[in-house]
């Protein structure tokens, strides 16, 4: 794994509506963007990024969470910087790895920040479905939920 370090440089969260307001058709979009790639040596590159979670309802913008940071990537740094400088492109395998690391680290941070701002978490919450069994369950027993 060529990712050597990962660090946050800026964490910003805003709620634009009152916490008591009810929203219709709330949609949460999250995005990771590489903003700059610079060469630190033959084998290392610095990758600056921005993660954004936008909260949109049908009638208003509800909130915004934005996280910026830096990744130290190890590999063919010259080739990565050359491709990025020429057209803002990374090789698909490198792009997948970098964006996966960004999302893996930023989404948990965004969940904590959303809780503090009284916004819904920027990930879907799993729904628990308890199957209905015919007949009456035994007294004092409850279904097991895994």
What is the meaning of each model-derived region?
Residues 1-100, 115-146:
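N-terminal intrinsically disordered, cationic/polar leader segments
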